[in-house]
Amino acid sequence: MLEKSLATLFALLILATLINRFLLWRLPERKGGEVTLRIRTWWGIVICFSMVISGPRWMTLTFFALISFLALKEYCTLISVHFPRWLYWGIPLNYLLIGFNCFELFLLFIPWAGFLILATGQVLVGDPSGFLHTVSAIFWGWIMTVFALSHAAWLLMLPTTNIQGGALLVLFLLALTESNDIAQYLWGKSCGRRKVVPKVSPGKTLEGLMGGVITIMIASLIIGPLLTPLNTLQALLAGLLIGISGFCGDVVMSAIKRDIGVKDSGKLLPGHGGLLDRIDSLIFTAPVFFYFIRYCCY
């Protein structure tokens, strides 16, 4: 099933590439440079992800740890506070806890131990100026890029009988999360009228949100029983939760960037912006979906 699912992703990319080339040929005046760049980047993302998700579990965990590191590093370039380098060592420790299936320690590590160590470390620096801003900014970055994001890696640890089961759960989450972004964008462009958060993200509309959520609920209803142990009702609820939480992650990251005064979080992914621009929805959908499916099925 994993191989068939990945083959479907490549088929969709081939279709998108052919459609883009056809439009460029038929409409030479159409400016398709950005779309072409986005598709090329998606090729790189899908190829890399396919190699990792098809490999052993430790490889996938290492991949997620690398994503957390790059995302946290990108976040640190945005905020105007000093980020202690020794805190980066918490990333491999966090994913080791996942690899050894230490769920209780995982729940304590970043939210509690990480917070206490971070706050105490800043006090020991000896300069109280900007203490609250520094600690809160760093801690929020940790929660987003390491703790919340690593819930996607926890999906690998849920099944005990089918080694591909966890990979299929990750694939299901990522496919719906990214499709949700695309669906809400297309619905918003085609029939969006009423803005949801005009001061944060003027392009987000109520019609785009509702259309995207309904689309993802239908997609979840179709592929949920194939890739997950969810029944029909649970698949619908999963689609609803992913659609809404993905929107929340998108607008929260937009609020952070607007507060800082930047349009994109970086330039790591050509045509997409930074890594945080690509995973902003996943930061919220990963923990929501993990706890939902853990409660329903495990």
PLM region spans:
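Membrane-embedded alpha-helical bundles of polytopic integral membrane proteins
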Residues: 1-241
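Interfacial loop-to-transmembrane junctions
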Residues: 259-281
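A short, conserved beta-to-alpha structural element at the edge of catalytic cores
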Residues: 281-282, 297
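Hydrophobic alpha-helical transmembrane segments of membrane transport and translocation systems
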Residues: 283, 288-291
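Juxtamembrane boundary at the C-terminal end of a transmembrane helix
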Residues: 291-298
